[in-house]
């Protein structure tokens, strides 16, 4: 549902601030931040921090986790250091550019959500036009680094991922359908392909299996977080699954996608001839992942909601699961050198 603030409300709030005791008045910098006109004066350090924040570093970390290990798998050992640096740095800039574009597109949504309203654009720390130019520059740098440092197939895949994330997910799906997570998440499945093609120059069955592991992993990961911030998404008018469906139905979907994630992770065993380290990690961490999803469903069926539903336990384990799985993908080839 749309969220708006009337002019009368703003006027009343302004009057209240003017008459309030000095100790109760808001920070004048914060007041300026939330005004449409006039941006807060920032130090050079604050400006740098704002531009870094636009790239969403935590998301980038997770994307790179699914890139580097695949290079070890594709190399059947340790990949060349120069190639690793070019691929990782190029991938970092590519992911950063996509995230900046997303911030530019979603600034109206971010203003309405408690979780995101302190990002640089809602706080007017960075002009929207400057952020757009910044995103373009990052994309150009990413293309040059990947193209010349790895190969142009990897650069092309990064471009496709960015275009999909910006135009298909951010502009087309996110505001229109609860399936935004399912199909929009495809953009996040490209890092394994990029890591593999950087080494081999071609796409094989192994990276395709990894692509689908991330594809099935993304919905339970995202929906668990959406449970936690359901009211935020509802206020911003974003139709995430926990907003438009009851908790038990969402929990069932999470369990289904979790089981599929673990099942497909085991397909990599015969396809890539993985050893016992990968198999053990995939089975054990996958079992815990499924148990976490099943417990979420049990709590949802018991009528527990909000904090009592404890969705963040699943969210945090989903991150741990993916990290452990891809760590095993990197380590396993080293054992068989």
UniProtKB/Swiss-Prot annotation:
One of its GO terms (molecular function) is protoheme IX farnesyltransferase activity. Residues 27-41 have a biased composition (Basic and acidic residues). It catalyses: heme b + (2E,6E)-farnesyl diphosphate + H2O = Fe(II)-heme o + diphosphate. It is an enzyme of class 2 (transferase). PANTHER family: 4-HYDROXYBENZOATE SOLANESYLTRANSFERASE (PTHR43448:SF7), PROTOHEME IX FARNESYLTRANSFERASE, MITOCHONDRIAL (PTHR43448). Carbon 2 of the heme B porphyrin ring is defined according to the Fischer nomenclature. This is Protoheme IX farnesyltransferase. It comes from Cutibacterium acnes (strain DSM 16379 / KPA171202) (Propionibacterium acnes). The gene is ctaB.
């Amino acid at each position: 549902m749309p969220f708006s603030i009337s002019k009368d409300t703003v006027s009343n709030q302004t009057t209240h601030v003017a008459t309030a005791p000095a100790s109760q008045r808001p920070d004048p910098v914060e007041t300026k931040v939330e005004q449409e006109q006039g941006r807060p004066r920032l130090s050079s350090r604050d400006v740098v921090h704002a531009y870094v924040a636009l790239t969403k570093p935590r998301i980038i970390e997770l994307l790179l986790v699914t890139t580097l290990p695949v290079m070890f798998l594709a190399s059947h050992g340790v990949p060349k250091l120069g190639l690793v640096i070019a691929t990782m740095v190029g991938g970092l800039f590519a992911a950063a550019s996509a995230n900046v574009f997303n911030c530019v597109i979603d600034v109206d949504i971010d203003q309405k959500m408690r979780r995101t309203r302190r990002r640089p654009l809602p706080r007017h720390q960075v002009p929207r036009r400057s952020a757009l130019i910044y995103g373009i520059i990052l994309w150009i740098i990413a293309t040059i680094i990947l193209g010349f440092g790895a190969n142009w197939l990897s650069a092309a895949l990064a471009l496709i991922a960015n275009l999909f994330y910006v135009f298909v997910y951010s502009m087309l799906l996110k505001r229109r359908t609860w399936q935004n997570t399912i199909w929009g998440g495809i953009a996040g499945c490209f890092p394994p392909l990029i890591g593999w093609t950087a080494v081999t120059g071609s796409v094989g069955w192994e990276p395709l299996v990894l692509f689908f592991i991330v594809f099935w992993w993304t919905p339970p990961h995202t929906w668990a977080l959406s449970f936690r911030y359901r009211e935020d998404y509802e206020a911003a008018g974003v139709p995430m699954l926990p907003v438009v469906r009851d908790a038990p139905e969402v929990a069932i979907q999470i369990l289904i996608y979790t089981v599929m994630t673990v099942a497909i992770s085991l397909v990599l065993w015969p396809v890539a001839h993985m050893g016992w380290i990968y198999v053990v990690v995939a089975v054990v961490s996958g079992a815990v992942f499924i148990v976490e999803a099943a417990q979420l469903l049990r709590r949802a069926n018991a009528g527990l909601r909000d904090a009592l539903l404890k969705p963040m336990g699943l969210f945090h384990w989903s991150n741990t699961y993916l990290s452990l799985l891809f760590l095993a993908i990197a380590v396993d080839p080293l054992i068989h050198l």
